[in-house]
Amino acid sequence: MNLTEYSHILFLSLCTLNFCLYSINSDDNGGWERGHATFYGGADASGTMGGACGYGNLHSQGYGLQTAALSTALFNSGQKCGACFELQCEDDPEWCIPGSIIVSATNFCPPNFALANDNGGWCNPPLKHFDLAEPAFLQIAQYRAGIVPVAFRRVPCEKGGGIRFTINGNPYFDLVLITNVGGAGDIRAVSLKGSKTDQWQSMSRNWGQNWQSNTYLRGQSLSFQVTDSDGRTVVSYDVVPHDWQFGQTFEGGQF
């Protein structure tokens, strides 16, 4: 990187800090807020697989290349996993590419308190930052920009098919990974019910979108209630058959 490029990135970084701390009034601007974005994961986004939401292979789970790791201020301890955001690069015509993208939250961008917020600590609180999969970033900005100011807002997630439930764990510890959630995309609460009981049991978030139950459920068909952050609930009755096995994935209803 030559001196001119370094000076540009340093200047942009300082401007970006001021940019991201200013919030747009959502009532006047359709919910748009301001933040900033960088990229990671390589040209093929292979470095974005896995992540703090627990989705694993983002291609097989349907999230693909349009993904983002969120800073602490946005990630909310995993509660925003699966949420969809529209982003557009703003206020830098030299590096911005017109148009917007929609990305899903699939990972956490951890803070780095050894670095200043305006000089490498992009994901430090209270900054609202998106570390985008590289192919997604390149749709709104040039590679050499490194970091750009963005406008962003929550948007509904459009998904094909139903909500997916992947059953992991052991007979006395069921860990259910929930993916492909439409609507708000992120989940507020999950309950399950075995076919041998009339009672719904609340599940607890273990990490990301992995939800746990300590109830013995082998030999029972399973039903799920999923409530998103908008407060809407989808019930998938007997979506898991009685002869289910750990490692299997089942598809239920959708928002």
Curated annotation (Swiss-Prot):
Q: Which residues form the Expansin-like CBD domain?
A: 172-252
The highest taxon in the source lineage is: Eukaryota
Signal peptide, first to last residue:
1-26
Spell out the disulfide connections.
Answer: C53-C81, C84-C157, C89-C96
- What InterPro entries does this protein map onto? Expan_Lol_pI (IPR007118), Expansin (IPR002963), Expansin/allergen_DPBB_dom (IPR007112), Expansin_CBD (IPR007117), Expansin_CBD_sf (IPR036749), RlpA-like_DPBB (IPR009009), RlpA-like_sf (IPR036908)
- Where would you find this protein in the cell? Secreted, Cell wall; Membrane
Question: One GO cellular component from the entry?
Answer: extracellular region
Broad class of where this protein is predominantly found: secreted
Gene Ontology biological process:
anatomical structure morphogenesis; plant-type cell wall loosening
Where would I find the Expansin-like EG45 domain in this sequence? 50-162
The entry's keywords: Cell wall, Cell wall biogenesis/degradation, Disulfide bond, Membrane, Secreted, Signal
Q: How does it sit in the membrane?
A: Peripheral membrane protein
Functional summary from the UniProt entry: Causes loosening and extension of plant cell walls by disrupting non-covalent bonding between cellulose microfibrils and matrix glucans. No enzymatic activity has been found.
Family per similarity comment: Belongs to the expansin family. Expansin A subfamily.
What is the official name of this protein in its record?
Expansin-A2
